């Protein structure tokens, strides 16, 4: 996954989700769960790179950060519960999808 469109399409394919732009800034697009309005996927560009923030179980947080250099502590979020993933092509699509799905599972 290397485009915002791909990431958003995957996030929106999960049950009962919707897209939101709460900051009235087109750079920040979120995907939320309808029933509780909790965000599980944030998309934005930073330093010329497309990034996503995803909620992470603290037990898996360091696994993902150690597995991929492009997975870092969550930008502008709680570093214990969120990771930032730089979509630079170094992480296989199935792992990005897994991280997004796990984030979804944590907020439903």
Regions found by a protein language model. Name each.
Residues 1-108:
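Charge-dense, helix-prone N-terminal extensions
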